[in-house]
Amino acid sequence: MGREYKFTGIAAKLNPLNCRLKLEIAEDLDERVPTTSTSCSVASVAAATATINTTAPTVLTKSELQKTLQKTSSSFSSSLATTTTTSSHLNAPVESMEGHSSLASYSHHHPSSSHHHHPGQQQSSSSSSSSHLQDFQSPPSASHPYYHQQQPQHQHQQAQQYGQATGSTNGGGQQQMTSMYGGNDYDQHQLHHQNQQHQASTSTQQFHHPQRPPPPQYDQPSSSTGSSLPPLHTVRYEQLPPPPSNQRTPTQQLQYPVKVVEAGGQAYAQQVQQAQQSNRSGAAGVNSALQPKPLPPLSSITSISSSAAGSSISAPSTSQPSTTSSLITSPPSTSSSSMAPRKTPPNASSSSLIKRQSQDVQEQQRVDFEVARNVSQIMSKNGLKVMHEPLLTGSLPQLAPLAPLPPPKSGVYQCPNCNRNLANARNLQRHRQTCGSAQHAAPQLAAMLQRSPPPCASAPPVAPPTAPSTSFQHHNSTGNLTLSYSSSSSRHQSSLYSPQLEHQDLVGNPNVMLSDGYEYKDDPMLYQGPSGLSDSIWSRDDSFHSEPPSASHDQLDMDHLGFPDPLQDPLHHLDSFDSADHRKETPRECHEPDELMTLDPTPPQCGSERFYGINIDDMPLSLDCDEPLMRSESASLSSSSQGRNTPAAVFTCEACKKSVSSERSLRRHYNTCKMFQTELAASGEERPPTTKRKPATKRPSKKKEASEGPEKNSAILAALRKEPAAPQQPQQLQFQQNYQPSPQFQAPYGGGSLPSISASWLHSASTSAAAAAPERSEMFTSPIVTSAPNPYIHQLPHQQPQQQKSSPLEDLLNEQDESADDDGDSRSSSGTVSNSTTTTTTATTTSSKSTGNPLFTCEHCARQLCSMSNLKRHRATCKVAASSSSNSAASRPPSQPSTPATAPATPMLQASQAPQPLQAPPQSPMETTATVTYTKTTVPPSVANTWNTEKAQLISPKPRSQTIFSEASSSMTVGDALRAQQHQQKMDQQIQIQFQQQQQQRFQHHQQQQQAGRIPPRPPNPILNQVQNPPQQVQHNQHQNQMLNPIRQPLLQSPPPPPPKKGLIEHKNTDLVLITSEPLAERMDAKRRSSEGLVAVTSTPLPPIQLPQRSQAPAPSRQQQQQPPVAYQVQFNGRPLPPMQLPPLQNPHNQQQQHQMLHQSQMNYQQVQQVQQVQHVQQQQNLQNQHHHQQQHHQQNQQQAPGNRSRSHSNVGKMEQEAQRQGSPLDSIITSVPLSIEVHHHIMKPGPLEQGQSSVDSQSTAEPSPRKASQQAYICPECKKTYASRKNVKRHRMAVHKLTLDEILANPEQPALDPLSAVGGAGRRHTVAGLETPDSALKPAPTKRKASEAPSAGVATKKGKAMAASVDEIQVKEEEEDQKEETVGSVERQEPPKKPVADDHKSAIAPLPPANTIMPPPPPYNQASAVPLNPPRTALPPLQLPPLQPLQSESPSWASMSAPPTALIPRTPRSSEFADEEDTRAMAKIAAELKRSAEDWPVLAVIEGVAAEPTNGEDIDEDEILIKRLRQGGVLEDVGDVSDLLRDVQGGVDGEPFSEDMLLEKNLSTASSVGLPSLASPGEQFGYQQYSQHPQQHPQQHPQQHPQQQQQVWNPNYEFQGYMQQQHPPMPVSQQFQQPLLQRPASQPPPARPIVKNSRRPSTTPKPPPNLTCSGCKKILGSDYSLRRHRAGCADVQQALNPEYPRPPKRKAAREAQKINEAEILASMPDPQMVAERSAAVAEAAAAEAAVERIGALPPPSVVHEIVHQVNADRQSMKKHNKTTSPPPAQEAPPTCAPDDPMSSSSSSSTSSASPLQGGAKPSTNQARHYCQFPECGKNFSSEWNLARHTRESCKMTTRAHSYEPTSAADKIDLIFMDKSKRRVSRTFLCTVSSLISYWLGEQGDRLELDTKWEHFQLLLDVHTLKVAITADNINLIAEQSKKYQLEHVIRMADQFMMNTNYTTPPTHVQL
């Protein structure tokens, strides 16, 4: 092996392909004719190389290279030209490919495809292939439309001609491929074709480096074209000499399948040269794409055809057929699999070459075939199968698609004929061999292919007809069209394909579609280049290749024509196809050789008139109907119109209007688009014969003017106008090249045969935007619409006037309100429209654009919706449809009969006419439904009309839609027709139902109006109807309900009944609708009920509806029903209820019947009402104590709902019946008006309430019980739990007991009996059953009773039972005084609980006076229910008397009595609720007795009887009693509970000595926490006395009357100590207090001891009150223990106990000192006389100063004196500085706040200056020691947390006023502030208040500089020492300063202040 040469330039780029040609390949090349053999070998080598995919660097031995170069040297110049073209193509910017996602991706995947360009045949071949690939990979620049690069004049060479289109740089690659496949052998063509596909795939896969385009090759002069085909080199060994810098690489030109130019090669070559020149200029120009690319010079073509045409021309048609005039078509006999169209024209020279090289070529083709097959498989697996083909396609020049390879779809292998998607190319080939659609279209394609496409206007003249015409053979087996080109073929007809083409092959081979323009596109060999690629890709997706290729190539050509670059608009070519024109208007129609050569390498894209000489108008509509074609069209249109590179290109599915970003996405969408598939199915099922499509005028690229909607509308309008879908004449918009596709060409592709699915909705958005939309029919407008501006669009105006009918449909279409695809069916039917229809549609479309999505337009109201689902939803509610529904039926027949009279025989024409019937229906707006579904499949007009009509009816209830469908049905598929029929049937049914409903509604409304005069119409409650109205009266019941509702409302004014509701159970007692006594468990279907009547109705009077019951109680307002309620119920039971039970409105007929029955029942009911009204009047007369408002309420009820009154006034017997009868099953459900109301009202009422009256009736009749209806409790039957409302009970039962509604109704919950009275206890259920069994009364429901009910059910201590009798008597007396009306009830309540129950039971059973007589009206109920204490209603409090609670508290004190009555009252109610009735009564009696005693001796009564009742020393500590007396005497105003104090003194907390302060604080806190103003003054006692008399007023009076005293209240230590000294200092505390207890003011006789004793628990074990508040800091604690523990460390308490408390103690010394202090305190207790004097002073003192003076009089040793003094001083300072609206929360609760709170007044002490949270409730753990850091304090704590809190809050050193002033020189420290001011402050104080400052001081010694002002810091210190109160003005500054210097105590104070005052946004303050 000689030296290995590395490839450079293009060869280097081909390296990725690993194109190492084996020696044998080189030898083969040697054996072959330089051109043909070389091209073949090169192709084969390239394929083989691609297949080999050798990774080794592409290196060939020198010998190999030499051989190859020698062989290719002869044609080197031509190869250079080819290479140049290729390189130019390769160098073409990839940008143009952007639009083509597939191309772009492929180019990215195969960037190196361009590397294959090598000089020589190999180079030419490989370059052609590679350039082809490159084209695919890197689409040409915008100037390079679809590979229409301007090639150098040398491009006319065969290599250039075949290797690459003269107009495309891919031509080189095509030449390569062509030459490769240009073998003489037919097999060679087959193999070559396949190999090209596969090579293209492989090469595309392998060539991943377009980045390195081969160095531009010198453009060879066109003169070289005359030479034989230059050898196409698949491998380029050496880099070609760089092209002249001044010479620009030829711009890429459209790569079309090899077009065989006939013998007139010179002329054709000239044309090619001209085209090339024009292309160059176009390349230089911005819009080179618009300029037709010159085909290879005719001379080159001729030479190619004459010379070894097989070599170069034989280049597989798969590669874009070079401009060579002749392509040799291998005999069709060749296996289709290997069949590759011969690329060499059947020239003698080519044949000779073929003969010489036949063996080699065959062998090479075999290799190539294998390679290509393998590559194709690999590509298919990798999704690149399509890409290489497009590359090849782009590479090849205008070679006509000789043998369309199975079009590998871009990722989708779709049959071009039937649009069937296949998994891979092989399957596609197989499918296409047997594809009926393809076979059907094959003849047409053959004819089309035989005809040469019209040359572009600018293209050089097509080769003269003398040029050998190519015979086009389509091999089904391979799916490739093998076209043998005869130079004799005419320039236009057979310039590319000879009319002598074997139509058998084409017809038999579904792949002929390629020749139609699709196959070659699919065939990268046939159609290469970016444009070709995109087109091919689309064509692949555009299963119908013939048309899409034409469209796409036409687009490519139309790039010359000014159409957007297909690369820029990937679907642009599709647009042409989508448009009826399918770019039929493309230069093909021009029939100019240049255009033909340049613009339409793939003849199909030639003018619509000629598809390779085929008159598309002559083409059967089946092609257009072919879904594949449509797809391809749409795809082609979209790609051609928008170009892949055009990002703006919008690809819109014409079927569903969905826009996608790329062709590939659009294709994928087609796979899933149901509408599209429907149309495809329609087209596939009945593919109407191809009709001529009108030439597509220049398609306005992406013009939205002709939107899809307009296309659809236009199609519909055209159909409506019944304009035959005759292909419009090539009224083509002049493309920039003055190209006008022939209508022939357009029609077949535009949708002649295929309903322009692609055009109508397959075409891209741009297509839709373009005229494509107008052209598209409703569903299937021909792709023409999407093509370049359709001439149809221009023609549309003419067409429209032709058949413009004023049909609503047409108007809607014009308005674009009608969407052709109003229904999926409409789409399908529209798809049926022929191309002519499409054309018509297009014309119409232009005139009418759809503003929205015309597909989804309501045919009734013309409203456009965004989706079919919305449209359907809209139809359901369309008012117009409803109004027109009746008319629609009439209009439907016209629409149905309306059939396209002018419908052409072709299905498309029929489809187009099908819309016309839609115009006929204009009779009804529904007929104008825009949903004209045109099915591609042709349906006989009659059948279609029938289907359409039925379908329209099914699809749209609206006649218009039906009409549309009927008309469109002619084109509808059977499925569409069936769907339309079904839809129509559904619509008819809906309309009928609606009509019936309307009729029923009218009737009902009429009935209601008639009844409205009497009763507001209301749907009878089935149960209510049964119960309330006899079955015969069921309808009447409805009216009654309606009539009763107004009546019921007045009746139920107390609980205004909710407005009558519809529904069975919906009617609640509030509506007076008696909840039928029939339990739901028993509820039956309407029939059963009607037959059986109500179950329990007879047993109980029915609700107001149960007029018979009311009739018993004559209701004047209801005179219609005379039957008594019971009788009425019996009637219900005996009578079958009509189906009325269901709301009559539910069933119109039933409703009518019900209304009738209601009317009758109402008449009867009125009679009963009259009777009931009378009864009710009588009952009302019996109502004695009924409140006036209730009387009015009942009167109103009488007037409005006699039934209610009747029930209200029903006899007790009725009540008994109700009690006996189970509540209505609805009772448990209906809770709107709780039975509690009825219970309250009716419990006291006679039976009618208890009878099956509705809750409303019962309520109205019954006097409101003392408790409100909302307060009525109910008992769960299962667990006997009481709930506040029936609803809650029901919920409970359903949730907990898992009961069903029926079960609940069967066993409804019963109201909890009111313990207050028998009536209340009876608590009739809120059911028809009336009062529940008295057992419920027995049940203690008082748990939820109000305080007013407490007397009967209040909780009383067992001890109180002994006194129960006396208390009951007292209560009875007071009740009689308070409520004479309640005398009976009160007596009953006063009786033992069983007795009231019995009474209740009796009340339930025996007829009782009306509830009003028995029960007081709700206003007095608070009084009545409570123990009747006359003045304050303390009857309620007595039951609830907090004294009773205080009895339970550890330290009974005035706190309980002084506590606001509100607080006191709730306690007793709770106790009464949860206690036995005996206890309640006992408590009530006690309360009454206490009241009397309080009146007699308020102080002692309160203290002994209520507060402590210390008569029993065992129950109460004598200390507490003594202290209380002292308080009464004013001696111990400031002393807390002595017991607590003593307790604190006796026991220490945390091992600390318990000073009196601590004990006192604990005591105080206990008292306060218990809520006892333990230190209340006598005034406070008097306040309590007042409270007892006026509990509601006392809370205010007490604090107001004794604010001073309250302020003084908290000096417990002082008062206590003084008192102890006065009493017996040496004596034990207990003894000391015992004596005072004996001393009681004679003026105050003690209250009855039994009461106190029974009502009180021993105070020795006080129960922690709800408020466990620290007396010092007011912090609320959770338990007494917590409180005591808190007191031990509470700074306030400590201060109160020890004035020097803050001093840091020396632990032991401190303890000892504490003990000593305690002893001193005890010893220094003032003597009794001092105490007396002190008490006198306290009585006189009105301010804190007086208290301080009194304290000062005490001996100095007394800590209490100091504390009091300090506290008073603090109070004064707080008064001065407190500017806040509320007491500074953070401060140590200045005592000034205490007076405001009566509760806290007793608990608050002068020492408690901080609020609970302020005083350090929140600890801080910044202290690690448990000792107070101040030795003076001497405190130690059990935890660091407590110590920190102590340091912050409790330490005297920190809280002492002026403590920050140094006490000694050693204690001073100089503070220097930012204002240079200097202050001396106590070091100890600073260290105490701030750990941070302490740290600083430790570091800095005696000086400390602070970055703040002295004023600010002083404020901080003053706040800390309580000199200054925190206010809203200073809070901000204080907060900042405290945080800055870490004064935790101040920080907490500030936080507390903010929290208490809700101070969220502190005001601005002085900045530090």
UniProtKB/Swiss-Prot annotation:
It is found in: Nucleus; Cytoplasm. GO terms for molecular function: DNA binding; double-stranded RNA binding; single-stranded RNA binding; transcription coactivator activity; zinc ion binding. It holds the Pfam family zf-C2H2. It comes from the Eukaryota. Keywords: Cytoplasm, Differentiation, DNA-binding, Metal-binding, Nucleus, Repeat, RNA-binding, Sexual differentiation, Transcription, Transcription regulation, Translation regulation, Zinc, Zinc-finger. Residues 346-362, 472-482, 1201-1211, 1251-1273, 1624-1633 have a biased composition (Polar residues). The Zinc finger domains 1 and 5 bind single-stranded and double-stranded RNAs. The Zinc finger domain 1 binds DNA in vitro. This is Signal element on autosome protein 2. It comes from Caenorhabditis elegans.
